[in-house]
């Protein structure tokens, strides 16, 4: 309805059906297929995480589910700004503003960081209030607090890491983004299997994988940008 009311159909060629351009479709798939695999792998590792937590016991699984619920809520602004970065980087490159891409990424990352600092401050200052939304059991609330603090640290790093990482896909280099994600997720999977199934560490220690994951994602993304900048100068 919005498209019909607001968009100029003739300007964008929407006023008539066009033949399927298989060459264009192939080019789109050659870029998007890496993104599809990337998202699939990211979701699959969460499955592995909860398998490892389940081996620790039902109590630990309950803690993980509660903390994960808060984690997902905190991810909303981060994911929103990361997706925005992807779109704006693509638009800026299309407009010929390649020289301004890094400045744009930095500005969005800074905004994301400060928003997350506020969110984390609320969570850290009022952990029981946040957790009580999901359970009224006092003992479970107390046991969930350490894991919540770990996630709070992870989200501060994620606020910057996700912006820089999603900007890579915005440049069209989805293959590089997939390689970075795969490398990080391999470490993620091995770490959680070891710490959860072999060491059988507490839930809060298991959640430390999120800190490691986002740190590696940020580091690898920055290294890629540094490498590309060096290649451009050469």
Spans of features found by a protein language model:
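Residue-level recognition of pore/gate-forming positions within transmembrane alpha-helices
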Residues: 69-72, 185-186, 211-214
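Conserved small/polar residues in nucleotide/adenosyl-binding loops
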Residues: 225-230
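Hydrophobic faces of transmembrane alpha-helices in multi-pass small-molecule transporters and flippases
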Residues: 1, 17-48, 73-77, 81, ...
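Small-residue-rich hydrophobic transmembrane alpha-helices
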Residues: 63-125, 158-177
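Alpha-helical transmembrane segments of multi-pass membrane proteins
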Residues: 26, 70-74, 138-161, 190
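Short membrane-interface helical motifs at transmembrane helix boundaries
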Residues: 118-141, 145
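Alpha-helical transmembrane segments of multi-pass membrane transporters
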Residues: 1-3, 119-123, 179-203, 216-224
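Helix-terminus/linker motif at the lipid-water interface of multi-pass membrane proteins
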Residues: 40-73, 91-92, 129-138
């Amino acid at each position: 309805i919005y498209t019909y009311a607001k968009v100029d159909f003739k300007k964008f060629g929407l006023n008539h059906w066009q033949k399927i351009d298989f060459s264009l479709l192939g080019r789109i798939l050659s870029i998007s297929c890496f993104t599809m695999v990337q998202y699939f792998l990211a979701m699959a590792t969460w499955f592995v995480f909860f398998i490892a937590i389940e081996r620790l016991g039902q109590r630990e699984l309950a803690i993980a589910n509660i903390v994960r619920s808060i984690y997902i809520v905190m991810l909303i602004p981060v994911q929103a700004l990361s997706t925005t970065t992807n779109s704006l980087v693509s638009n800026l490159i299309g407009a010929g503003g390649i020289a301004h891409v890094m400045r744009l990424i930095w500005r969005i990352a800074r905004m994301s960081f400060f928003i997350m600092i506020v969110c984390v401050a609320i969570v850290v200052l009022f952990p029981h209030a946040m957790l009580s939304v999901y359970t009224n059991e006092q003992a479970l609330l107390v046991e969930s607090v350490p894991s919540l603090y770990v996630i709070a640290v992870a989200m501060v790093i994620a606020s910057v890491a996700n912006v820089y990482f999603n900007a890579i896909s915005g440049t069209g280099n989805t293959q590089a983004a997939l390689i970075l994600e795969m490398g990080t997720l391999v470490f993620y999977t091995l770490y959680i299997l070891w710490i959860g199934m072999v060491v059988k560490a507490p839930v809060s220690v298991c959640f430390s994988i999120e800190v490691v994951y986002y740190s590696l994602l940020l580091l690898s993304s920055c290294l890629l940008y540094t490498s590309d900048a060096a290649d451009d100068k050469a």
